[in-house]
């Protein structure tokens, strides 16, 4: 059986990792913080690799998740906002030099407004774009942010141009990232900057873990490497000029819940640790060099 790459050239692709279950068994949870005690096999779709452009993508790439995002209510994320704020402040420090009081900024996938709330005081105009009605409402009411609920494709055709467009942990979810990159380029001012973050599938950790890599889940459709992302950015006149690693501050409670999913045989130990209240206030700094921030 042959597979076509979803890139514009539709090159022939081959199976990189074969799923060990039927496609109808896959359970897709599009919440940012999705985790549960489901069998981990449900989190591992078949991965394919283009023979020409080397793009790695999921067998679920043709499934439209947009309607699911609209109805997302992510209570786990809300409970983790104090920790998410610490992480996104680290991100802000790394992108700060590209923002100023005259900047008009668009954040694609603004979710519950944590990054927008950090950015807003430092720029002229901040606009968030979000599919989740619940997340957008929360952002508006809690942080008084300008957040629009609209499809990305439709919004980027309005002709407005920005100094900076930010897209953190979003590109891997998009139905058609190639068309979106094309529209983003047209939505940037002449000296505008696109800042996006995603995981680098060619980095050491995913190479070692292979199909057990923790970010290999159904809600992620595309798995870019530094080289494939650079290739597609260049294709749409978005020239990559800088890459920084992305450090995360994660609560121990959230991390233990993740471990329960990925190592169910040790769930008893992780659940025991969760019984201690002090665990809820602890954080750990994580940088395994597989998450990057790209500037173009």
What are these regions (language model features)?
Residues 186:
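Basic phosphate/pyrophosphate-binding loop/patch that engages nucleotide-derived ligands
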Residues 1-168, 178-181, 245-246, 278-295:
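Conserved N-terminal segment of class I S-adenosyl-L-methionine
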Residues 103, 191-193:
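Surface-exposed loop/turn positions
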Residues 41, 167, 175-183, 193-296:
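S-adenosyl-L-methionine-dependent methyltransferase catalytic module, highlighting the catalytic core
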């Amino acid at each position: 059986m042959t597979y076509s790459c979803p890139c514009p050239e539709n090159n022939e692709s081959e199976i990189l990792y074969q799923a060990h279950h039927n496609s109808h068994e896959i359970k897709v949870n599009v919440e940012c913080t999705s985790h549960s005690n489901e069998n981990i096999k449900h989190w591992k779709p078949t991965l394919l690799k283009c023979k020409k452009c080397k793009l790695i993508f999921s067998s679920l790439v043709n499934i439209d998740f947009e309607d699911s995002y609209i109805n997302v209510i992510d209570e786990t994320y809300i409970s983790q906002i104090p920790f998410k704020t610490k992480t996104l402040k680290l991100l802000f420090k790394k992108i700060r030099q590209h923002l100023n009081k005259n900047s008009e900024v668009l954040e694609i996938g603004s979710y519950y407004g944590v990054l927008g709330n950090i950015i807003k005081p430092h720029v002229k105009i901040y606009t968030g774009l979000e599919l989740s009605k619940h997340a957008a409402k929360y952002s508006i009411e809690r942080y008084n942010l300008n957040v629009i609920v609209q499809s990305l494709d439709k919004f980027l055709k309005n002709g407005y141009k920005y100094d900076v467009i930010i897209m953190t942990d979003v590109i891997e979810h998009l139905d058609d990232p190639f068309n979106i990159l094309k529209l983003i380029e047209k939505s940037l001012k002449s000296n505008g900057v696109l800042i996006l973050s995603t995981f680098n599938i060619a980095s050491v950790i995913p190479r070692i873990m292979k199909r057990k890599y923790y970010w290999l889940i159904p809600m992620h459709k595309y798995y870019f490497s530094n080289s494939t992302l650079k290739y597609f950015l260049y294709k749409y006149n978005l020239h990559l000029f800088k890459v920084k690693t992305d450090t995360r501050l994660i609560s121990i409670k959230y991390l233990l819940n993740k471990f329960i999913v990925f190592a169910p045989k040790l769930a008893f130990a992780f659940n025991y640790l969760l019984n201690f209240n002090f665990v809820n206030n602890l954080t750990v700094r994580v940088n395994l060099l597989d998450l990057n921030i790209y500037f173009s």
